[in-house]
Amino acid sequence: MDTILNRILTHKRVEVERQRIKIPDAQIRARAEAAPPPRDFAAALRAHRPIALIAEVKKASPSKGVLIENFDPLALAHTYASNGASAISVLTDVRFFQGSLKHLEGIRAMVDRGAVPPLPLLRKDFIIDPYQVAEARAYGADALLLIVAALDDETLAALLALTHSFGMQALVEVHNEDELRRALDAGASIIGVNNRDLHSFTTTLETTRRLAALLPSSNRPLLVSESGIFTAEHVALVRSWGADAILVGEALVTAPDISSKVRELGGGS
């Protein structure tokens, strides 16, 4: 089936091989192993109650095109960190989201020199290859996104284990009951429920309600609600369903006053 996700993954395989030629596996792994210790992504989410905000540095999307003109990833991250975000998600997909690893690297440098609070950084991309895991750590990620719909069980388990071996954590993204079961079977401790169907790109917050009810009560993973969250009412809704955190991009970058929107969605004043 020719879906948006399948088109993205087809291109991603080519992109990874091109990147591997530029910076070979051994070199990117050495850079990853030499990177400063990662910050604790899960702890940052748990520390912020009643709900944590993962604020996303996002220029564009496949469905809506460019979302913010005069895009400045460092200024955006600074605004997020200064207004109460718990973590920062950085889109690094070039072709479909107009992101870049350079954005991640630049934001990490800004955090490390103390220009903003020391928030953990999440690499948001379509990660399908071990190379990208090492690459995430090399460029400063503390955590990364693994999309269950893009991976078979063996690859999901291998990428999750490799992520942990670098000291990073994984936000394991699901959209339906089968994907949630697969994520739990793989040992995911942070589950991201994407309210957007990556095949059709339609969105409903009901996805969070439906899947939150299926989480185990013992050793319950952290639950992050992703996509379709635009108002404080939306935040209250997903929180009432058991979300520990929200991941928001579009609502922030399209807001007339980004600082105020961060405080609104993050529960600040």
From Swiss-Prot:
GO biological process: L-tryptophan biosynthetic process
UniProt pathway: Amino-acid biosynthesis; L-tryptophan biosynthesis; L-tryptophan from chorismate: step 4/5
Enzyme Commission code(s) on record: 4.1.1.48
Main EC class the enzyme belongs to: lyase
Transmembrane segments: none
Keywords linked to the UniProt accession: Amino-acid biosynthesis, Aromatic amino acid biosynthesis, Decarboxylase, Lyase, Tryptophan biosynthesis
Pfam families from the UniProt entry: IGPS
Keyword Lyase attached: yes
Enzymatic reactions: 1-(2-carboxyphenylamino)-1-deoxy-D-ribulose 5-phosphate + H(+) = (1S,2R)-1-C-(indol-3-yl)glycerol 3-phosphate + CO2 + H2O
Keyword GTP-binding: no
Single GO MF annotation: phosphoribosylanthranilate isomerase activity
Family matches, as HAMAP family: IGPS_B
Record family assignment: Belongs to the TrpC family.
Name recorded for this polypeptide: Indole-3-glycerol phosphate synthase
Organism of this sequence: Roseiflexus sp. (strain RS-1)
Gene: trpC
